[in-house]
């Protein structure tokens, strides 16, 4: 992977840098950055990873890196790439590396109905630390039998609510209603075993549960639509599909990579006619057997993640009832994924496109006129939740 991308950068307007198509790239790459941020001394691997993603067969538009881009598995974290479903005979590439191992890792913002004034935040923090399981293990999670796990994998947040792990009224505040449609849900026994006891657990790494206070409201119209006011106490949850999602990704990375061989420093699939720069970008045609198997399993893991954040929300409700009594009214302001691939319709460079949009460390940002934006989101669009890492006081 030659480090030649620096010879092809140009400003694309305030806060945007273009890496012009060169070499085997099939499209330009765009970074949310300023040119001076790409000088000598930065970690060159992330821009090179972005350049590599622009070689994925069927790419439409540009390969994008959001403002917090950094090095990841195959794709840079913050990477967004769309591939056409109409490319070739079976569609463009779908890459597990473009979603990542924590499938449907996402952020949920909760309103509480209480003000910072007069609230014992320290007491709430202590109670949350006691009642919300965190760390690598699944200790303290909800144990699910096989039938209950199947229900979660197929029904997502709604199934969790049916089990008392969340409320049906929460669903309108969750991306896609907390449900990704699946068919076979053919995930491995190993993945199932890793999910059987981890529902309602936070995990480790940069995952967190954080009590926040609304310091300042800038967009009054949107804030009022979301029920957000200065001085309000809110709670933010950052978690995903735990070990189940990690295993689903691992299983399909192995399966798809087995169709590639190294040839001249590149990775080639003669079966699919795909030629990529990095093994970690291994992708299958969207409508191939392997592509569909990954998409279906990814959606099932995505449903588990929605249910996991719902179960965590219910733990927050219980803690606030204990800590502040009946004054607390926990509601879901919004829940959005930042590790997912979805089939979506977009207009790209003036042309209608049905495409598989990979978002890795990046969220969608739909405006109020999008068909999914109903109720309180209809006129203002969805919130885009941008947290800091655990301990950085988002």
Language-model features: where?
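Domain-length cofactor-binding catalytic modules of enzymes
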Residues: 2-49, 59-62, 73-77, 85-96, ...
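Short, glycine/acidic-enriched loop or turn micro-motifs at the edges of active sites
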Residues: 70, 105, 241
């Amino acid at each position: 992977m030659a480090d030649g991308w620096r010879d092809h950068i140009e400003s694309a307007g305030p806060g945007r840098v273009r890496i012009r198509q060169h070499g085997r790239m099939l499209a330009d790459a765009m970074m949310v950055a300023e040119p001076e941020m790409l000088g000598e001394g930065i970690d060159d691997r992330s821009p090179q990873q972005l350049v590599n993603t622009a070689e994925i067969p069927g790419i439409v538009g540009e390969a994008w890196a959001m403002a917090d881009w950094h090095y990841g598995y195959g794709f840079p974290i913050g990477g967004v790439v769309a591939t056409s479903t109409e490319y070739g005979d079976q569609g463009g590439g779908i890459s597990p590396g473009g979603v990542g191992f924590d499938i449907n890792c996402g952020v949920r913002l909760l309103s509480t109905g209480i003000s910072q004034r007069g609230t014992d935040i320290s007491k709430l923090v202590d109670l949350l630390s006691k009642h919300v399981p965190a760390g690598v293990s699944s200790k303290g999670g909800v144990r699910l039998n096989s039938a209950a796990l199947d229900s979660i994998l197929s029904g997502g947040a709604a199934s969790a609510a049916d089990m008392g792990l969340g409320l049906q009224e929460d669903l309108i505040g969750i991306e896609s209603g907390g449900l990704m449609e699946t068919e076979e849900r053919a995930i491995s026994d190993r993945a199932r075993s890793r999910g059987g006891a981890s529902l309602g657990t936070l995990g480790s790494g940069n995952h967190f549960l954080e009590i926040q206070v609304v310091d300042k409201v800038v967009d009054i119209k949107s804030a009022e639509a979301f029920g957000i006011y200065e001085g309000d106490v809110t709670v933010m949850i950052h978690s995903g599909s735990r070990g189940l999602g990690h295993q689903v990704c691992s299983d399909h990375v192995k399966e798809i990579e087995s169709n590639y061989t190294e040839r001249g420093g590149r990775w080639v699939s003669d079966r699919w006619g795909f030629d990529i720069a990095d093994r970690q970008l291994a992708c299958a045609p969207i409508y191939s057997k392997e592509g569909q198997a990954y998409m279906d399993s990814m959606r099932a893991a995505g449903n588990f993640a929605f249910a996991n954040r719902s179960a965590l929300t219910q733990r927050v409700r219980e803690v606030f009832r204990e800590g502040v009594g009946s004054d607390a009214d926990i509601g879901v302001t919004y829940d959005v994924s930042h590790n997912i691939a979805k089939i979506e319709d977009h207009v790209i460079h003036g042309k209608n496109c049905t495409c598989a949009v990979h978002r890795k460390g990046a969220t969608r940002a739909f405006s109020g006129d999008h068909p999914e934006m109903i109720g309180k989101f209809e006129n203002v669009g969805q919130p885009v939740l941008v947290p800091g890492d655990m301990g950085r006081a988002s």
